[in-house]
C-alpha cells in the first residue's frame, strides 16, 4: 500500500514539474504581448485561426494563445492569471481535471483553454450547475472573449429555439448541464433539420465537474409526454391502506433504504383489497402501487427528500446541493404516491419519449474536461468512466485555515446545544460563521434554536435559493451568521469583510458528516480562500444518519463504559474521526458500484440510442428521394412475414399471407387466394413486392411535386420511428426491473438485460419497417394545394398519414392464424402476443 501511495505522489510531482515548464513558456511571452497595442493584440485571434486552418495544431498555438488571453485579461478585467492558473488551464486543454482549491480563480483559469479551443471554430461549451452562474460567468468573462474577437452565447431554458440556435452557433456557449442534455434530446425529436439547435458536441469544460459527472451521474434527463391515466384512485387507496399499518406490518432495511410488507402486512393487504393472494400475477400492478405508497410514507421524508411548494406541488430536493430541482419528478409512480401522501393533486403519469444520463451525454463530446476543488477522492471513477485524470494544482498562497478535529456527542440535542454555544461565542466577538447542514429540516431546526438564543442570522436552503448569491456574498462580513443547506451557494466566493482577518477569518461549522468526504471538503473549502485565515469544525452525534447506518454501536459502547453525562460525553479523538471516514468510504464505494452498474445498463440503451438517432439524423438531413430506403423496408417486411409462416400447413400459410397482403400491402380487391396458389415462397415474395411497388408508385403520384414527396417520406418514417422508440424505452425500463429479480436465480442480470434488449431492439426494427410499409400503402393521400408557408408542409404531410388503426378487419378468421405468425391487425407483434391473447 505504501509503495502504491509513493508511486501516486511521485507521478503527481512529475506531472507538476512538466506543467511548470509549460507555464514558464507561456510566461516567456509576457513582455512580447505587453508591448502590443490593443488592436495588435486583438488581431492575434484571426492570426491564430488562420494558422490553425493552415495545419498548426491547438497544442502548437497553446503558449502564444494563453499569453494573449493573460494580457487581454489584464487589460479588460484587471486580472492577470497566476502561474498556477496557467498550469490549471493546460490541464483543462488536455482534457483532464485540475483540482484547484476554492478561491483560486477557476473561472479565470478556464478563459485560456476556452479561448484556445474556440479557435478551431467547432464550438466550446462552458457548463455550470445553475442559470445564475451561467449568466454571471458569461457576462463577466464574455467581456474578455468579445474584446478578443470571439462570439459568446448564453443558453437558458426560457429561450426560444431560434435564440438557442444562435447561442450554440457562437464560438463559446455558456449553459447549464441539464439544458445541454434536454436540447440534445429535443434535437433528436424534431422533424426538420432546420429546427435543430445544437452543433455536433465538440469540447465541454464543466465547472463543479464532480457535482455533475459524479453526484448527478445517475440522474436521467427525461423528455416525456402525459399518458391518459385512470389510476389516481389507486394511488389514494394504496396511500390510505399504508397509513393504516403498524410498525410490525412492514420491514425497512436502513442501509439500503428499501421497504416491503411483512407477513402481517400482506394479510392486511389481502383483507383491505379483498384478494386471495396479493402476489398472484394478476395483482402485479397493485403491488407496485403499495410498494410506492410504502416508500412515500416511510422512506421519503418531507423537507429532506422533497418540499411542498406554495402551489401545492411536490418539488424534489437535490441531496448534494440542497436546492429544489424544478421540473424534475420521481419516475415509476413514486412522485404520484408522494402527492397522495401529502394530499396535493395527483398529476397524471407520463411516458418517456427520450432519455439520457449525464454519464452518457458528456462521454459524447470529442474532448471533456472540468474544474473542481474536490476531485481526488473520486479519481478512480473519473478515470474509469470518463478517461479523465485528476491533477492537483498547488495553491497560489499556502492554506492558512485551521481544521479542528471532529467533536462527537451522544445525542442530537447535546450536539446542537454545543453548536449554538459555539456560534454565540464567535458571533459576540464578531467572527463570521457559516453553518452547513445536510437537510432543509436541520436548517429550520437550527434556525429556531438560534432565534431562541437571540442570534441574528440568514438561512439559505431549498426554500429560498433565489437569494443564494446575495446571502453567500455577505457571509464573510463581521458578525454574519449564515446557515446553508449542504453546498448551496457553491460557485460564489465568500470574501472577508473589514477587520475579519484579525478575528480568525470565516469559521465553517458542519453539523454532521455527509455520505461523501468530498462534500465535507467542499464545505471546509468555503473558508481560507487565497491564503486567508479561517477555521473549520464538525459536530457529530450518534443519532446522525451516517452514524446510525454505519457502525455507531462500538462508539456508543465506549461512551456507556465511561458512564459520562450528556454534557461531559463529548469525544475528540483521531480514532473516531478515522471510523467516520471509514464509514464514508464504505458509502462512497457502494455509490460508485451502483453508478458502475447503472452505466452497464445504460450503455446498452446508449448503443441503441446512437443507432436510432444516427438513422433519424440521416432521414432529417437527407436532401434526396428516400424511395430506395422505403423499398428496402417493404421488401424486408414481406420477406419476414412469408418466412415466419413458411413452416405452417400450406392452406393455413396462404390464408395468413393473403390477409397480410390485403390489410397491409395492396387494395383488398386486387388480390385473391388463386394469385398465391402454386407459387414457391420466393415467388410469393417477388409477386407481393412487385404489387407493393405498384401501390407505392400510385401513392407517390398523388403528391404534387418532388419536395412534397420528400416531406411525406420523412414525416412518415420519423413518426413511426419516434412512436416505436418511445414504446421501446418503456419496454427496456420494464425489462430492467424484471431482470433485477432474475439475479436471485443465479443469473447475471446485466448479461440477461443485454441479450434480451438486443432481441427486443431487433423486434423494434422489424416493427418500424412493418409500420412504415403499412402506412405507406394504406395512407389516404389527398391531392394537395401548394401550401403558403414552409410550416404547412409538415402539417399537411403529417395529416396525410391517416392509415387505419391497428384493429382487426371484420372478416378475419382468427382460427386460421398461427400463434407465431404476425398478427393481421398490423401491430407488428406475433399473433400470440396480440389478438391471440384475447
From Swiss-Prot:
EC number: 7.4.2.8
Gene3D superfamilies named among the record's database cross-references: Helical scaffold and wing domains of SecA (1.10.3060.10), P-loop containing nucleotide triphosphate hydrolases (3.40.50.300), SecA, preprotein cross-linking domain (3.90.1440.10)
GO process terms (BP): intracellular protein transmembrane transport; protein import; protein targeting; protein transport by the Sec complex
Residues annotated for ATP binding in this entry: 85, 103-107, 493
Gene Ontology cellular component list: cell envelope Sec protein transport complex; cytosol; plasma membrane
CDD domains: DEXDc_SecA, SF2_C_secA
Swiss-Prot/TrEMBL cofactor(s): Zn(2+)
Comment on bound cofactor: May bind 1 zinc ion per subunit.
Chief place where the protein resides: membrane
Family assignment from sequence similarity: Belongs to the SecA family.
PANTHER family on file: CHLOROPLAST PROTEIN-TRANSPORTING ATPASE, SECA INNER MEMBRANE COMPONENT OF SEC PROTEIN SECRETION SYSTEM
NCBIfam families in the record: PRK09200.1, secA
Record function comment: Part of the Sec protein translocase complex. Interacts with the SecYEG preprotein conducting channel. Has a central role in coupling the hydrolysis of ATP to the transfer of proteins into and across the cell membrane, serving as an ATP-driven molecular motor driving the stepwise translocation of polypeptide chains across the membrane.
Protein name (record): Protein translocase subunit SecA
Phylogenetic lineage: Bacteria, Bacillati, Bacillota, Bacilli, Lactobacillales
Amino acid at each position: 500500500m505504501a509503495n502504491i501511495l509513493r508511486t501516486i505522489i511521485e507521478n503527481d510531482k512529475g506531472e507538476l514539474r512538466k506543467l511548470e515548464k509549460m507555464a514558464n513558456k507561456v510566461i516567456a511571452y509576457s513582455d512580447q504581448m505587453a508591448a502590443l497595442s490593443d488592436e495588435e493584440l486583438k488581431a492575434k485571434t484571426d492570426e491564430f485561426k488562420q494558422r490553425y486552418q493552415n495545419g498548426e495544431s491547438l497544442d502548437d498555438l497553446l503558449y502564444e494563445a494563453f499569453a494573449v488571453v493573460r494580457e487581454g485579461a489584464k487589460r479588460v478585467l484587471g486580472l492577470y492569471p497566476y502561474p498556477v492558473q496557467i498550469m490549471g488551464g493546460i490541464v483543462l486543454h488536455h482534457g483532464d481535471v485540475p483540482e484547484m482549491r476554492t478561491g483560486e480563480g477557476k473561472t479565470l483559469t478556464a478563459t485560456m483553454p476556452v479561448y484556445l479551443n474556440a479557435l478551431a471554430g467547432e464550438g466550446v461549451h462552458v457548463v455550470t450547475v445553475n442559470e445564475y452562474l451561467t449568466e454571471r460567468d458569461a457576462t463577466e468573462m464574455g467581456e474578455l472573449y468579445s474584446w478578443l474577437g470571439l462570439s459568446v452565447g448564453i443558453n437558458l431554458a426560457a429561450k426560444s429555439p431560434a435564440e438557442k440556435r444562435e447561442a450554440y452557433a457562437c464560438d463559446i456557449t455558456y449553459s447549464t448541464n441539464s439544458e445541454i442534455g434536454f436540447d440534445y434530446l429535443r434535437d433528436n425529436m424534431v422533424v426538420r433539420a432546420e429546427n435543430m439547435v445544437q452543433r455536433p458536441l465538440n469540447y465541454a469544460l464543466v465547472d463543479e465537474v464532480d457535482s455533475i459527472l459524479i453526484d448527478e451521474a445517475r440522474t436521467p434527463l427525461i423528455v416525456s409526454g402525459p399518458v391518459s391515466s385512470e389510476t389516481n384512485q389507486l394511488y389514494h387507496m394504496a396511500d390510505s391502506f399504508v397509513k393504516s399499518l403498524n410498525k410490525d406490518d412492514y420491514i425497512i432495511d436502513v442501509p439500503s433504504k428499501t421497504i416491503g410488507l411483512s407477513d402481517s402486512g400482506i394479510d392486511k393487504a389481502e383483507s383491505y383489497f379483498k384478494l386471495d393472494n396479493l402476489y398472484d400475477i394478476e395483482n402485479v400492478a397493485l403491488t407496485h402501487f403499495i410498494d410506492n405508497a410504502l416508500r412515500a410514507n416511510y422512506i421519503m421524508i418531507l423537507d429532506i427528500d422533497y418540499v411542498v411548494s406554495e402551489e401545492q406541488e411536490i418539488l424534489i430536493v437535490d441531496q448534494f446541493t440542497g436546492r429544489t430541482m424544478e421540473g424534475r419528478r420521481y419516475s415509476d409512480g413514486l412522485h404520484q404516491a408522494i402527492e397522495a401522501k401529502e394530499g396535493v393533486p395527483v398529476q397524471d403519469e407520463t411516458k418517456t419519449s427520450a432519455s439520457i444520463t449525464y454519464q452518457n451525454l458528456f462521454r459524447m463530446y470529442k474532448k471533456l474536461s472540468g474544474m473542481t476543488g474536490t476531485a481526488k477522492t473520486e479519481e478512480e471513477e473519473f478515470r474509469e468512466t470518463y478517461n479523465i485524470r485528476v491533477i492537483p494544482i498547488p495553491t497560489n498562497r499556502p492554506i492558512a485555515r485551521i481544521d479542528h478535529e471532529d467533536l462527537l456527542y451522544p445525542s442530537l440535542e447535546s450536539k446542537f446545544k454545543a453548536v449554538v454555544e459555539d456560534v454565540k461565542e464567535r458571533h459576540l466577538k464578531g467572527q463570521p460563521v457559516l453553518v452547513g447542514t445536510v437537510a432543509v429540516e436541520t436548517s429550520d431546526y437550527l434556525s429556531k434554536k438560534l432565534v431562541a438564543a437571540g442570534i441574528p442570522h440568514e438561512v439559505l436552503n431549498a426554500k429560498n435559493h433565489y437569494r443564494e448569491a446575495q446571502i453567500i456574498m455577505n457571509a464573510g462580513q463581521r458578525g454574519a451568521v449564515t446557515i446553508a443547506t449542504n453546498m448551496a451557494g457553491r460557485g460564489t466566493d465568500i470574501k472577508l469583510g473589514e477587520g475579519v482577518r484579525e478575528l480568525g477569518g470565516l469559521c465553517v461549522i458542519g453539523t454532521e458528516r455527509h455520505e461523501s468526504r468530498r462534500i465535507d471538503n467542499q464545505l471546509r473549502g468555503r473558508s481560507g480562500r487565497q491564503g486567508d485565515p479561517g477555521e473549520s469544525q464538525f459536530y457529530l452525534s450518534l443519532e446522525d444518519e451516517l452514524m446510525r447506518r454505519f457502525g455507531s454501536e462500538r462508539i456508543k459502547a465506549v461512551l456507556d463504559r465511561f458512564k459520562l453525562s450528556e454534557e461531559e460525553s463529548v469525544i475528540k479523538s483521531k480514532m473516531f474521526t478515522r471510523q467516520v471516514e471509514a464509514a464514508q468510504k464504505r458509502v462512497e464505494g457502494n455509490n460508485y458500484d451502483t453508478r458502475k452498474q447503472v452505466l452497464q445498463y445504460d450503455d446498452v440503451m446508449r448503443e441503441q440510442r446512437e443507432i436510432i438517432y444516427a438513422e433519424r439524423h440521416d432521414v432529417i438531413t437527407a436532401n434526396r428521394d428516400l424511395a430506395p430506403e422505403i423499398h428496402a423496408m417493404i421488401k424486408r417486411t414481406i420477406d419476414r412475414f412469408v418466412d415466419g409462416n413458411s413452416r405452417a400447413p400450406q392452406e393455413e400459410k396462404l390464408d395468413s399471407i393473403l390477409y397480410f397482403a390485403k390489410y397491409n400491402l395492396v387494395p383488398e380487391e386486387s388480390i385473391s387466394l388463386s394469385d398465391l396458389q402454386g407459387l414457391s415462397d420466393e415467388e410469393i415474395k417477388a409477386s407481393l413486392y412487385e404489387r407493393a411497388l405498384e401501390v407505392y408508385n400510385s401513392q407517390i403520384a398523388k403528391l404534387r411535386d418532388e419536395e412534397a414527396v420528400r416531406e411525406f417520406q420523412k414525416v412518415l418514417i420519423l413518426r413511426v420511428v419516434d412512436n416505436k422508440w418511445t414504446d421501446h424505452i418503456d419496454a427496456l425500463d420494464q425489462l430492467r426491473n424484471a431482470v433485477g429479480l432474475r439475479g436471485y436465480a443465479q443469473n447475471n442480470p446485466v448479461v440477461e438485460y443485454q441479450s434480451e434488449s438486443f432481441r427486443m431492439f431487433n423486434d423494434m426494427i422489424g416493427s418500424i419497417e412493418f409500420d412504415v410499409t403499412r402506412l405507406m400503402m394504406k395512407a389516404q393521400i389527398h391531392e394537395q394545394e401548394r401550401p403558403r408557408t414552409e410550416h404547412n408542409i409538415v402539417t399537411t404531410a403529417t395529416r396525410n398519414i391517416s392509415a387505419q388503426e391497428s384493429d382487426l378487419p371484420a372478416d378475419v378468421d382468427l382460427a386460421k392464424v398461427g400463434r407465431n405468425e404476425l398478427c393481421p391487425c398490423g401491430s407488428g407483434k406475433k399473433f400470440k402476443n396480440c389478438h391471440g391473447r384475447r
